[in-house]
Amino acid sequence: MYLSLVDFKKRVEFSLCQQHADDDDVRSFCEKAEKVGVGVVCVNPVNIPLTVELLESQGIEISANIGFPFGSHLPEAKILETRRAVEAGATQIDMVINVGALRSKKDNLVAEDIQGVVEAAQGRTVKAIIETWVLTVEEKQRACRIAEKAGAALVKTTTGVRSQYLLEITSDPKGATIEDMQLMRNVLSPEIKIKASGGIYTLDFALHLIRAGADQLGMSQGEKIIRQFQEHYGNGVELIA
């Protein structure tokens, strides 16, 4: 598989999810995204209007965080957030599924939650975030199947948010892993894409994730890693499985 620099950039998603992000932060973030040439930026719903104003003409997809970061919002709240984000110009949606319902084996509730957002998105790409770092293997498999059946176009590993509650479960929360990429790729249909997010800090790991099945990469270190790709491989590299 040949991976060009342009394709690598398009796989990278920049995120600005901090609760304290102000207008100046959004402007700086968008300027960086435009300069680097990433494929997608992801921001909180309240920051969609300014992000659209700054990036709409640059060919960069603009995604809204929905139900962030825990996914425990009522379905009606997620639907309203999605509708407002779409009205403001969002072209994609990153939604957190109802993880508690999944772990409680209330699969119908999980599916209905996703379906509501998919319908509210009106044909825009919906990414279902399943929070792999708190799930068993069986729960990850079930989450992937539910998300695909409910209409998600892409399944994402984690929000990347390391909360106090997460640290109460594990002292070493992991984001994207090679094992999860392989598991998700084996469960999902070929047309359903996978986004690896959380803990991607090196170029080598990013390339390993792509080899394992990742279509998109959510990285806080994206600018640095893109620069390293260009320094090491120039315009592209042949990835050996």
Where are these regions (language model features)?
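Alpha/beta enzyme core
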Residues: 2-36, 40, 46-194, 201-241
